[in-house]
Design a protein with these regions (language model features):
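Conserved anion-binding
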Residues: 36, 40-144
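C-terminal helical cap(s) of enzyme catalytic domains, especially alpha/beta-barrels
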Residues: 182-188, 203-238
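Glycine-rich, proline-tolerant flexible connector loops at the mouths of alpha/beta enzymes
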Residues: 1-15
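A C-terminal functional module that forms or caps the active site or interfaces directly
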Residues: 145, 149-196, 200-207
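Catalytic PLP-binding core of fold-type I/II PLP enzymes
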Residues: 16-40
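Hydrophobic faces of well-ordered beta-strands that scaffold small-molecule active sites
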Residues: 2, 32-34, 71-73, 96-100, ...
Length: 238
């Protein structure tokens, strides 16, 4: 799940590095989630969707630009911002993750506001489920949701609202989320959630637990962190 802002800050060379990262991951057989959090309307949203998930036309030819498998999308502008992504997802058989309840501490300033007695994130979750009915895969829809591990009780409610949506769960590890917090993000069959840990794995060697590896052996520290993460989540799911 490469975070595009970490590349954008370096300008054109950074964007070239982002493309190389995506290509390298795909060469290794990995599913790539472009953490781009795009949100606009009409032709602008369509351009974002085509640039990251589809193919852009140049004259009589077309080619894939960044070519991720999934992208994160901000729903604040409503269906006008999401529908262009849906069109590309259905054409390319790719997917999006819509921000529903994010893991950051101030997310509640807007996402928890009540509308007719219900928090906004529940209404967004219902919209994600509705969008998903228009773009179904075999078991799950092409429209997933971002729900932070730091809000497990809200995750429990949202899983019931969106039974056919993959839930991308950030906030594990560096932001404080634990395996026990993740149980309700999964369906009863143990599927349906994608748990993300970025800093907790990439920079594992900086943590006291893995400091013995040292910076020069950062990859070994990352492997150990992944193994511990898998054991933690499996243990919680039973």
């Amino acid at each position: 799940k490469p975070q595009i802002a970490m590349y954008e800050q370096f300008g054109i060379p950074g964007m070239q590095a982002f493309k190389k990262t995506v290509d390298y991951c795909k060469e290794k057989g990995l599913v790539v989630i472009g953490d781009i959090k795009r949100g606009d309307i009409g032709s602008t949203s369509a351009a974002y969707a085509v640039g990251h998930l589809g193919k852009v036309a140049v004259g009589s030819k077309s080619y894939a630009a960044f070519d991720e498998d999934f992208a994160t999308v901000n729903p604040y502008l409503g269906s006008d911002g999401v529908n262009p992504f849906l069109d590309v997802c259905k054409e390319e058989k790719k997917g999006i993750f819509v921000l529903v309840k994010t893991s950051n501490p101030s997310s509640g300033e807007f996402q928890d506001q009540k509308i007719d007695g219900r928090p906004l994130y529940e209404l967004v979750g219902e919209k994600v489920a509705a969008w998903g009915t228009e773009a179904m895969g075999d078991e799950y829809s092409y429209v997933g949701a971002v729900v932070g591990a730091t809000y497990p009780e809200m995750g429990k409610v949202l899983r019931k609202i969106m039974p056919k949506a993959y839930i991308l769960v950030p906030g594990y590890g560096a932001q404080g989320g634990k395996g026990k917090d993740l149980v309700h993000f999964f369906n009863e069959d143990g599927l349906g959630a994608i748990v993300n840990s970025s800093r907790g794995i990439i920079a594992a060697y900086k943590q006291e637990k893995y400091a013995k590896f040292g910076a020069e052996n950062f990859a070994d520290a990352s492997r150990a962190a992944v193994e511990d993460m898998v054991a933690d989540i499996k243990g919680a799911l039973g």
